[in-house]
Amino acid sequence: MVITVLGERFFDPMIDVFLDAVEAERPGFDVVQPWRRIGDPAAFRALAEEAGLSGFTLREDTDILTLESPDDWWRIVIGSGLRRTAEALGEETAERVRARCGEAMQALGITQVDLTSQYLLATRP
């Protein structure tokens, strides 16, 4: 059996830009990030052990995604769990968040994001 979860580096460094933009546009807005619960390998290992799995192997990979323009970042937002936040903000606020992200991306010279995935390989008991 294989179980895959997102790792600690979730669209770094743009995730922080996105969260800052959301906070600037809607202070106190709760951005739901369920992947953070088991993002680090120790938490993932503990969850597997709690589920009764043993003799498993954990592996972590990092993919680098190239961003050629701010539109590439927004496609990632809309194609990921961040879409929930963008939709909850409403169209006008989401557009302002999108603009802030694009401006920061260009100002900071961000041309790629990292995405870490963790894999648990186990044999069913």
Where are these regions (language model features)?
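Conserved class I S-adenosyl-L-methionine
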Residues: 1-27
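Conserved Class I S-adenosyl-L-methionine
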Residues: 35-125
